[in-house]
Amino acid sequence: MGSFLRSLRRDGPPTPSVGATPAKKEPPVPPVTPLEKMLQDMGAIREDGSDKFFGMENYGNTCYCNSILQCLYYSVPFREAVVNYPTRTPIESLEAALANTLRYQNFAANLEAEALAEKQKAANAQRPGAPPNQPQKPEDKDSPEYKKKMALQTLPLLETKNNATSYGMSESLFTSLKDLFESVVASQSRIGIIRPQHFLDVLRREHEMFRTAMHQDAHEFLNLLLNEVVANVEAEASKQPEPERSLPPAESADSTELSGSSGSKTPNTTRWVHELFEGTLTSETQCLTCEKVSQRDEVFLDLSVDLEQHSSVTSCLRKFSAEEMLCERNKFHCDNCGGLQEAEKRMKIKRLPRILALHLKRFKYTEDLQRLQKLFHRVVYPYHLRLFNTTDDAEDPDRLYELYAVVVHIGGGPYHGHYVAIIKTQDRGWLLFDDEMVEPVDKNYVRNFFGDRPGLACAYVLFYQETTLEAVMKEQEQENMDLNTSVADINDSTLKQNGYPLSPGLAHVHSASQIPSPSEPARFSNLQRAPTAPPLFPHPEHADSESSPADPSTTASATPPVPPIPDIHSLPLSPKKSDSHFKKERAKEEKERKANEKEKEKQRRRDQEARIREQRREDAEIRAALEASKASKAEEDRRHSPDDTKKSSHGLSRLKRGSKSFSHRLGKDKENRVSSSSHSATPIAEHPPSRNGASESQQQLPNGQSPGSHGLHTRHTGLDEERDTLKDPKHDRSGHHGKWRSFSLKKKSFSILS
Amino acid sequence: MAQGPSCASELHYYRALDHANAGFATGTYHLKDDLHLATPPPHPSEAPVVNPNPLATVPTPPTSGVKLSLVSVGQRNKLPVFTSKEKVTAPPFADGNPALAAIPTKDGLKRRKPKNNIIKSSSSFVSRVITHEASSKRLNDRNPDGLFAFANINRAFQWLDLSSKNKEEPLAKILFTKAHMLTHDINELTKSSSHIDIAMGSSAGDIIWYEPISQKYARINKNGVVSNSPVTHIKWIPGSENMFMAAHANGQLVVYDKEKEDALFTPEISNHSAEAMKASSRLPLQVLKSVNSRNQKTNPVALWKLANQKISQFAFSPDQRHLAVVLEDGSLRVMDYLKEEVLDIFRSYYGGLICVCWSPDGKYIVTGGQDDLVTIWSFPERKIVARCQGHNSWVSTVAFDPWRCDERTYRFGSVGDDCRLLLWDFSVGMLHRPRAHQASARQRTSMIASNTQHFNRHRADSASNRMRSDSQRTADTYNDYDSAVRHPVEPRARTALLPPIMSKIVGDDPICWLGFQEDSIMTSSLEGHIRTWDRPREGINDSYNGNTSSPAISTSAAGSGSGIADSAMGSL
């Protein structure tokens, strides 16, 4: 426990007076970082993790992962869902685990570095506010590199261990994400650095493209991660009724509670990612010959929008839904008049997601250069947003969103650079997350990344979450209040009163030393929400740790043996997708093959050209690196391309393609231009009922699922099927030229290059 | 509408005249002039503007694009045909306060000048002043009806004579050390050929009262002694020789008197406890110093706190009684500033509001904001009239064209970060509401109810809104003053949508200011391009004939913007 006590030192001036703090190692106190300064007035640590501010270690170009993970962590509903699904690990077991994995730094070892820092600080102090252009090369204290180094030296390091068995799941990207989130939530230190090594291991094990140390696309990673979480969760859900399932009924009680309290349309506990990020696009196509309007729905997890110079996100979204003429080589196959016709098409949003992830397509494939280029267009984004491009029958078409996170790409091109995230936290304003470094920033700072500033830093992915005008107004009232006035105090006192967030187990271990005010800890084991936060998500609170039986793997979970890698993963996968996919593939194969191959051939040629063009790039180093990866990837592509249409049994490749097609389906590959007939020619009945749905209902019914909700359930199954059928159209595409083409090109060349 | 970034040299517009005349009038504005102001290099004492670290978290000081204050000191009346029919009946500001009664000027008609000579100034605030070597000759020779323009760019402030042949050479140029002038205004009441009163507000919070002809100046709110946050907007109070109003970025509206000295400001409110401050901060207006205060020896004359948010802009109503204020929090607050109270609070569709103006007759308020929308609000009916969609980015300035307004139709323009100038026409009878299943309707046929009906309904509306606002408030003792009506955001389905009659890219950089003159439209941009567009020579009633007489038309008829222009093209 000594290590926990030492953490107090990090909590800043208000707490160190606590008697239990040993007065050792005080001399080499590193300078207080802006983050620590800001956190000085924080009350007790909350249980929901909203007041934890952890940097993430960068293992060489893993900033794409770090920035996205931070954005997801600070989405309150997403974090709560991850932490609570399938059940929340009791805090005691986490603490036991953390006692091993949270490593405080040996300050003595860093003494020297700190002494150096002190010296430099003194040197710098002589010229306060001096511009950083002084030729003092060795170490600029304001440089992010220095700050990260210091952070790594001084802050507690948090390792994560695979805890999957305690969730009753096999190890997957989801469980390692949950490992990460739970560790941070349960950490007794408010700040520190988390090491996502294990998460990356799993990611790289399952996704070849992330195995290199190359720069990766953050948006692509986000899409993959969300899809993967969906897949993992659904796979687990489908295999849960297995007899050897070790989880006690508590878990199922929890899941019924989940479904009961979530209050949303679906009782399916596995659908929380869908409920947060998923929206529905409707593409309306009006044949100009017979004027018949045909509609088709597609779901998306994020929206990718084309950019224009001197525009706004609002305008980009409107352009996204602007009418498009399908003519010439790009005609529309009209069922009604039978044949290719000119048509007018528009995409509108029919169901608005609760979290709107907007991908600004800054990397654009330019035909004349034959490669991706970064667009430095000035694209402004407001703090709040509503969507103009909704259908007339959309529910809540005036839904208000607030910007809560921005992923910024810094660099001149798509193949290198750096990602950071700027995130609005629940009650600590905006913070900059730059790998290991976390720093509070001004609200106006968020606007530095419209794309027109020097420094090559541009917003790349924007996260908007739903909110209400009342919440916004309340927040605006609080903004810019002098922090030393009553507001801060009031905030603090409320935090202390009803925010005493420690669960029983936690409290008795640490309260004596941890909490300055020895007030009677309130018994709030449910999650806290800051008063200013909008009532985002009627999310299920996790089952009371008192009521739920002890987790079977409290101590074992701390360091479970790493399972043999490949088998474990391929087993739990839901056969649903692969099966239906397989069948469908087969059914369609003949029809599609020609078009498909033509398209592929074209792409390949284009890629080839792109590659040749690439070789001429001046930047020799980058080129070399690129070449290597391109070569390997191209080879891999060649290897896999036959698989794409024929083979679907090998776990890895199938998974990969599944996610890709998913991502295609999700808002990228927009239109089935020639295949409205082929689409309708695959009626839903043709597909066997999804095994997923069936097995889920098996799982749910014994747990007291009402028949009514079962009905709802099957409705969703149907939806799944529908989506499966929607997957096909992309294969029908054969070289039309439209606004979506650049994107698919982009996708293509991206996967080649990265 | 795919349009190249290059700016065209003509602006075409198509205008629906009225119902009787089904045709569209068209016209072409020709680019007469493109004056480019040089951006001054940073002052040597300033840190390099370009920080090598794009993630540097040090806040950057606010700056603004080029804005113009135009003045003609000649005698010729250049007022547009259509102005408010009603005479200004409002008493002047601060009428009831004997402490602010105008001191009879001892020097008779002679205007008082500021004390300090800016050319010889040793102030650390002013870096240097460059006057044109022949400035006095130029002043003597010029046509008195010609326009002077005052323009801020970066840390420079320039005095230009737009009627001069060498107008690119400023008559005078002031370079400040660090502060950027963000806003300035000319007192229309006191201007003469020998005297121009200019108030300008800086990013440091300091305000300069500048008289260019004598090159004298005075510094007000020196070092932010009254309010230490940047001045985002400044205007002379209509009808006042000495008083001007400044909006600060901290949400304060301050009235200063150019003749008064500064004094350290302490709020003059009775209950001064922190708790009370907090409670009253919920009010739409906290009077921290009233204009009726007896203590008027020093500045400020009055100080109101509207919010903790930046005030973007404000505008006085033509009847000089009301004030429309727009804020970064997305609210439009309509005040009776003589009575120091907020009457109505409207909200943008989303995002902050940036600019605001009144129709010449005072019936409508137009705002522009971060929702890319221009929004028309009816002041007498206290409701939203229409949302105008056509900008591709944030709207930086809106202005009515008083020469193209009459009792039934109104013309206004807007410019924005999308480098576009948009012109809009609206007449109440022609607005339509989007029908639920026909959002794309471009027909401008359906009508909304007549005014009187609206007026009746408005009463009911506002009553219910009032109740809503009451219930929102926390129970405290500050209810009594909060008479403001908080209007909810109207859903899109219930609000009329207006397309522009013209949309044109007029530059390569964001446009930040727009002004209508009798014979031209002027715009200025972020990087210092001041463009003048000549009005069509023909009057608004000429339609096609004017077009064909102009050789420019045929070459660029396709250059017009979106919306109604398309259908007009079809009819041509």
Swiss-Prot record, chain A:
Ranges of compositional bias, category Low complexity: 546-559
Keywords: Coiled coil, Hydrolase, Protease, Thiol protease, Ubl conjugation pathway
Comp. bias (Polar residues): 253-269, 692-708
Region Disordered: start-end pairs: 1-31, 118-145, 236-269, 494-754
Bias kind Basic residues: ranges: 653-665, 733-754
Catalysed reaction equations from the record: Thiol-dependent hydrolysis of ester, thioester, amide, peptide and isopeptide bonds formed by the C-terminal Gly of ubiquitin (a 76-residue protein attached to proteins as an intracellular targeting signal)
Record field: compositional bias (Basic and acidic residues): 236-245, 576-647, 717-732
CC annotations in GO: cytosol; nucleus
Pfam families attached to this UniProt entry: UCH
E.C. no: 3.4.19.12
Active site residues according to the UniProt entry: C63, H418
InterPro entries in alphabetical order: Papain-like_cys_pep_sf, Peptidase_C19, Peptidase_C19_UCH, USP_CS, USP_dom
Coiled coil region boundaries: 580-629
GO BP term, example: protein deubiquitination
Domain USP: 54-467
EC top class, as a word: hydrolase
GO MF, one example: cysteine-type deubiquitinase activity
Family recorded in the similarity comment: Belongs to the peptidase C19 family.
Quaternary data: Interacts with creA, creC and qutD.
Its biological purpose: Ubiquitin thioesterase component of the regulatory network controlling carbon source utilization through ubiquitination and deubiquitination involving creA, creB, creC, creD and acrB. Deubiquitinates the creA catabolic repressor and the quinate permease qutD. Also plays a role in response to carbon starvation and the control of extracellular proteases activity.
Protein name: Probable ubiquitin carboxyl-terminal hydrolase creB
Source organism (scientific name): Aspergillus oryzae (strain ATCC 42149 / RIB 40)
Gene from which the chain derives: creB
Curated annotation (Swiss-Prot), chain B:
Low complexity composition bias: residue spans: 549-572
SMART domains xrefs: WD40
PROSITE patterns, sorted: WD_REPEATS_2, WD_REPEATS_REGION
Keywords: Repeat, Transcription, Transcription regulation, Ubl conjugation pathway, WD repeat
Region annotation (Disordered) ranges: 36-61, 458-486, 541-572
Pfam families per record: WD40
Positions annotated as WD repeat: 226-266, 306-347, 348-387, 390-434, 506-543
GO biological process: carbon catabolite repression of transcription
Highest taxon of the lineage: Eukaryota
Any one annotated GO CC term: cell tip
InterPro entries membership: WD40/YVTN_repeat-like_dom_sf, WD40_repeat_dom_sf, WD40_rpt, WD_repeat_creC_regulators
Function: Component of the regulatory network controlling carbon source utilization through ubiquitination and deubiquitination involving creA, creB, creC, creD and acrB. Required to prevent the proteolysis of the CreB deubiquitinating enzyme in the absence of carbon catabolite repression. CreB deubiquitinating enzyme stabilized in a complex with the CreC leads to the expression of genes such as those in the proline and quinate pathways.
Assembly behavior: Interacts with creB.
PANTHER family tied to this protein: AT02583P, WD REPEAT PROTEIN
Sequence similarity: Belongs to the WD repeat creC family.
Name the UniProt record assigns to this protein: Probable catabolite repression protein creC
UniProt organism field: Aspergillus oryzae (strain ATCC 42149 / RIB 40)
Lineage: Eukaryota, Fungi, Dikarya, Ascomycota, Pezizomycotina
The encoding gene: creC
